[in-house]
UniProtKB/Swiss-Prot annotation:
PANTHER family: TRANSCRIPTIONAL REGULATORY PROTEIN YEBC-RELATED (PTHR12532:SF6), TRANSLATIONAL ACTIVATOR OF CYTOCHROME C OXIDASE 1 (PTHR12532). This is Probable transcriptional regulatory protein Mnod_7401. One of its GO terms (molecular function) is DNA binding. Belongs to the TACO1 family. The lineage of its organism: Bacteria, Pseudomonadati, Pseudomonadota, Alphaproteobacteria, Hyphomicrobiales. GO terms for biological process: regulation of DNA-templated transcription. SUPFAM superfamilies: YebC-like. Transmembrane segments: none annotated. GO terms for cellular component: cytosol.
Length: 248
């Protein structure tokens, strides 16, 4: 999670989300539709749908778009998407997990493989790197909702396993089976979280030099640019100097 979160910060600082807003909205809408189709179309009764709606709000997705994506799941013409996980390696041996939703497995596999190859990485078999990660629940809040000690105390009471707090916010992690209850307890105290989801958290984060870091960031960008890709999780971290460079 640390490596993934750090990279996400880079993405926001560079403004890439604004540059590809229609693509971002398309991916968010797809997850909303899939979540609504798999469960009930009521976010209050469907934890995955609620998480998808929260993610959409965090990206300032218009309310009409969100409602349209939910209604699409209720219609008979909604596409059927298959959820697939890909695993691979990047420059320097860094590990990546890619989550995708697709209506054409062959197309998506080809696109993801091409992105890995073009950026100096290699797609591996499922299970090749996932053992280096833990599947956990994540509940994220803005820093302003509480200080670090207050959040830690509340998270422990809610049944969470760990909390990371800094100026960018609070990230509470828990067993994946406990995500719903932990999120509900924390929301009752601090209000709506900015994100609730299941993530792949690296057991160990690998520090890479700036040259390798730039190559890895390019790889992740190329993978995330694929329409069918929903999430990319990594086990690397880049230097503060490279972060500052990318921020400029």
């Amino acid at each position: 999670m640390a490596g993934h979160s750090q990279f996400k910060n880079i993405m926001h600082r560079k403004g890439r989300v604004d540059a590809v807003r229609s693509k971002v909205f398309g991916k968010l809408a797809r997850e909303i539709t899939v979540a609504a189709k798999l469960g009930t179309p009521d976010p209050a009764m469907n934890p995955r749908l609620r998480a998808a709606v929260l993610a959409a709000r965090a990206e300032n997705m218009p309310k009409d778009n969100i409602e349209r994506a939910i209604k699409k799941a209720c219609g008979g013409d909604a596409e059927t998407y298959e959820e697939i996980r890909y695993e691979g390696y990047g420059p320097g041996g860094a590990a990546l997990i890619v989550e995708a939703q697709t209506d054409n497995r062959n197309r998506t596999a080809s696109d993801v493989r091409s992105a890995f190859t073009k950026a100096g990485g290699s797609l591996a078999e499922t299970g090749a790197v996932s053992f280096m990660f833990d599947r956990v629940g994540l509940v994220a809040f803005d820093a302003k909702v509480a200080d670090a000690d207050t959040m830690l105390e509340a998270a422990i009471e809610a049944g969470a396993d760990d909390v990371k707090s800094d100026e960018s916010g609070h990230e509470v992690t828990c067993e994946q089976s406990a995500l719903g209850e932990v999120a509900k307890a924390l929301e009752a105290r601090f209000g709506e979280p900015r994100r609730t989801s299941l993530v792949w958290r690296p057991q160990n984060t690998v520090e890479v030099d700036d040259e390798t870091g730039e190559k890895l960031i390019r790889l992740v960008e190329m993978i995330e640019d694929q329409d069918d890709v929903q999430n990319v999780f990594v086990n690397f971290a880049v230097s503060d100097a490279l972060m500052a460079k990318l921020h400029d």
